Amino acid sequence: VATTRPETLFGDTGVAVNPNDERWKRFIGKNAILPLVGRKLPIVGDEHADPDQGSGAVKITPAHDFNDFEVGLRHKLNLISIFDKEGKINETAPKSYQGLDRLKAREKILEDLEAQGLLEKKEKYEYTIPFGDRSGEILEPFLTDQWFVDAKKLSKEAIKVVKEKKITFFPQSWEKTYFDWLENIQPWCISRQIWWGHKIPIWYGPDKKPFAAMDEKDALNKAEKFYKKKVSLVQDPDVLDTWFSSSLWPFSTLGWPEQTKEFKKYYPTNLLITGFDIIFFWVARMIMMGLFFTKKPPFKEVYIHALIRDEKGQKMSKSKGNVIDPLELTNKYGSDALRFTLSSLASPGRDIKLSTQQVESSRNFSTKIWNASRYILLNCLLYTSDAADE
């Protein structure tokens, strides 16, 4: 088999071959032996294995690769997590590898495979590696316990209200984006390992049993009833996904779950104005949560506006350094020039590619209009120079 990540070898729990690959299909149902460990690996038939890539046989490491995880679920393969939180090889590997940084482990594994005559060849291979937006570090899939929402169940009503025109999109073409995402929705991971956010309202008992509660007092009462005695609890250290918290915004800001006068007056609202890039992040999730908790859609219409991108059509972001500050443009070229630029480029559903040169051209054009207008007014008998200045 070929791999770009030899360091994950100790987490391999299977080998996949394409069931239509004449070279390998006779081996399906048999076992291969994992080098350096001697563990038996079942050979499974799965279309994830591409006969035209490499040897056509793929090592499956369900705990450290997203695609392999899905293959593992389909074939009930074991999950073996081989890294600790520092990216070092843990105790699941042979002792000589334990504690090694994953990249140093890569080198040692290759050396040991070669020493045993098990390394066929090494070659350069170009492929896409995921990097952290802020850290710039290589991202490694890592198996952890997380909280999930059954988004498939919630999506059914959300699809229904748009199909029945209880919620409409403008431009209507964006409904396709909405439907495509909801009809193929996956379980939604709502727990995050970050500093900022709403703490997950889960407390754990001495045996790690979880208790969902409104607050710690409520959790302690539930735990006491369960254990028949008072116990200490520890709250889950994770926080909720920002988009989960945001999905509750239309009604949580109005005093829900209480039937406040604000909730009765302002929920549901009429119109939501937003960009297409968060139709599934926010719009769909607000609709799902609104229908689930209040039995009403949170709004009646969704107006999708364009995104303002840089001159190359890329989305503006701080990490790319391509953000154009509207305040700086206004200070340099004037608010009328910026308004005219955006108005002239805007059309329903189409993004705007903005550059400072466009705003400068609009400023020059606006100056000509201004000067022409002053010239006309100064030459009208009914106007004075003071009126022209105004």
Give the location of each predicted region.
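Short hydrophobic-aromatic micro-motifs
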Residues: 1-3, 8-11, 15-17, 57-60, ...
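Short, amphipathic alpha-helical segments that act as regulatory/interfacial helices
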Residues: 284-291, 366, 370-377
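Conserved small/polar residues in nucleotide/adenosyl-binding loops
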Residues: 383-388
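Residue patterns forming the tRNA-binding/recognition surfaces of aminoacyl-tRNA synthetases
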Residues: 53-207, 314, 320-366, 370-371
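Alpha-helical recognition segments enriched in aromatics with Gly/Pro capping
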Residues: 47, 75-87, 194-197, 201-350
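Short capping micro-motif at the N-terminus of alpha-helices
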Residues: 1-2, 41-43, 92, 141-142, ...
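NTP-handling and nucleic-acid-processing catalytic cores
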Residues: 1-86, 158-191, 225-229, 252-266
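Proline-centered turn/helix-capping motifs that create local helix->coil transitions or kinks
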Residues: 121, 294-296, 373-382
